[in-house]
Amino acid sequence: MSDKQTDKDEKTGLSRRGFLGASALTRSAVAASGLVGGVMTRDSWAAAAKEAQQKIHVAPGELDEYYGFWSGGHQGEVRVLGVPSMRELMRIPVFNVDSATGWGLTNESRHILGDTAKFLNGDCHHPHISMTDGKYDGKYLFINDKANSRVARIRLDIMKCDKITTIPNVQAIHGLRLQKVPHTKYVFCNAEFIIPHPNDGKVFDLEDENSFTMYNAVDAETMEVAFQVIVDGNLDNTDADYTGRFTAATCYNSEKAFDLGGMMRNERDWVVVFDISAVEKEIKAGRFITLGDSKVPVVDGRKKDGKDSVVTRYIPVPKNPHGLNTSTDGKYFIANGKLSPTCSMIAIDLLPDLFAGKLKDPRDVVVGEPELGLGPLHTTFDGRGNAYTTLFIDSQVVKWNMEEARRAYKGEKVNYIKQKLDVHYQPGHLHASLCETSEADGKWLVALSKFSKDRFLPTGPLHPENDQLIDISGDVMKLVHDGPTFAEPHDCIMARRDQIKTRKIWDRNDPFFAPTVAMAKKDGINLEEDNKVIRDGNKVRVYMTSMAPAYGLTEFKVKQGNEVTVVITNMDQIEDVSHGFVMVNHGVSMEISPQQTSSITFIADKPGLHWYYCSWFCHALHMEMVGRMMVEPA
């Protein structure tokens, strides 16, 4: 077979590659040099490689164009990267315990974690930034916890989690997206697994009428659950439209099965579309129930005797769909086939007619179903009419034109596939710059590959993931960077750096540590001046200031068995002068950044002298920033 024929087969999806496949760098370099089908010289190869490196190089002292926010998967955190350099800037602990900052240990963080502080794990997949009029407003980032059915909110001005909500009466919050217009009023999140209601151990049959899962909406400001909608089948991924009326979610288990074979039995599953305005009307009219001890209004969105609910419509699509993505032009919900080589294009402007009963068949809203390759999982967009879909089995990203795919669905002979690019290996999510908004700029794309195999130095049986940066600014995709990541990012999101406004030091009136300020006020303490010990029966509260390189208290005395709370206020006013506090041999560690108040509580269970020290290098005399706790025997 000639090179020309091979290229043709790749574009039309006829060729089936091996697992490792051809080098993506080779393909990109050839394309960049204009030598498709030819032989590269040493000079042309070097020129292409140099061009790729120049694209992503951010010189010392210069700043990246974008903030990237990566989910940490079952590590439980959010990671902040600069794009295009792919340099890691910060880690934001959310559902995990972090000994550097004290997240999960400090009283402030445990107050935010609430009753779920007992969980030491999390599984976060989908980070999304709040919006106004379909554009990022940089106020919040939201993320799910599949492991313990939670949703968290991160304040982007301080890059700290400030609210965590447990979703009641469901299991495994997976897909998460935000209302885009007029602003992010709701955080929409899918509960993946079907459970009995009540889930009290008396019923285990998933076929039971009272076994179901629910679609959930969380108020973005209060972080209270606003409503839940019962659905047929299960829920996977979700997204919202650009009108504020519709959201949609994929279902891969319409069979309500619990085994692999059962979940793949049906040739078609569905996308369920929610009319959010109709849900709100049902609740306002009092047509809802509540479940168990929860006061959250629950609307039934299941079909009854073949008749649709007023709040949902079920659109059949090929089997076991996974990703659900809204095109940046607001025209389509794209459902990614997973076990089908296709993506289904749902025309959002036809949904009002579907809900009004003007269409004979729910499939009438499907206006395109392009065949793309094996294992399509997620789709992103460049704002120029092109979509980019990950092909998990083929280990590729495929670029295709949406309007041409729609024309092909009508029978026109048109090649909607523009390029297939090898990635390394088995990509899941992918994300283009600003692609969740109406401002998609078509510059960069990240393919989050699940396997790295031979791409990096070996690290034992556990390998890093591979997040690959792809230049999509031109007509041809070019792979420009491999980025190893620790387990296991699922998705990422990119915003322009001007859209994120961060504080340099803390505001003394910040609500993050308001409960600690209130406690100090009750004790008659001025946190910015006082260095005192308050004794309250068996409880001891130690208040101190800190200014590098010294604590306001260099020693304090307690009794064995006392519950000790140490409260420290960092009085430095220079950015980046963070202090730490570690009590040796007590499992105590926390960060106190400039103008922040932090506190931590522990039991002084060992008599004797115990040193505490500053764990952050805040000063040349950082080693001398110490103190001692003297514990008298009981």
Swiss-Prot record:
Record GO terms (molecular function): calcium ion binding; copper ion binding; cytochrome-c oxidase activity; nitrous-oxide reductase activity
Primary enzyme class: oxidoreductase
Residues engaged in binding Cu cation A2: 614, 616, 618, 622
GO-annotated cellular components: membrane; periplasmic space
Binding positions for Cu cation Z4 per the UniProt entry: 490
Protein's UniProt keywords contain DNA repair: no
GO process annotations (BP): denitrification pathway
CDD domains the UniProt entry points to: N2OR_C (cd04223)
Cofactor(s) listed: Ca(2+); Cu cation
Location in the cell: Periplasm
Pathway: Nitrogen metabolism; nitrate reduction (denitrification); dinitrogen from nitrate: step 4/4
EC number: 1.7.2.4
Cofactor details (free text): Binds 2 calcium ions per subunit.
Catalytic activity from the UniProt record: N2 + 2 Fe(III)-[cytochrome c] + H2O = nitrous oxide + 2 Fe(II)-[cytochrome c] + 2 H(+)
Family annotation (Pfam families): nos_propeller (PF18764), nos_propeller_2 (PF18793)
Binding locations of Cu cation A1: 579, 614, 618, 625
Gene3D superfamilies: Cupredoxins - blue copper proteins (2.60.40.420), YVTN repeat-like/Quinoprotein amine dehydrogenase (2.130.10.10)
Binding-site list for Cu cation Z3: 126, 429
Binding site for Cu cation Z1: 322, 378
Residues engaged in binding Cu cation Z2: 125, 174
Keyword terms of this UniProt record: Calcium, Copper, Metal-binding, Oxidoreductase, Periplasm, Signal
Record note on modification: Predicted to be exported by the Tat system. The position of the signal peptide cleavage has not been experimentally proven.
Annotated positions binding Ca(2+) 1: 450, 465
Protein family: Belongs to the NosZ family.
NCBIfam families reported in the protein's UniProt record: nitrous_NosZ_RR
Protein name: Nitrous-oxide reductase
Organism, scientific name: Pseudomonas aeruginosa
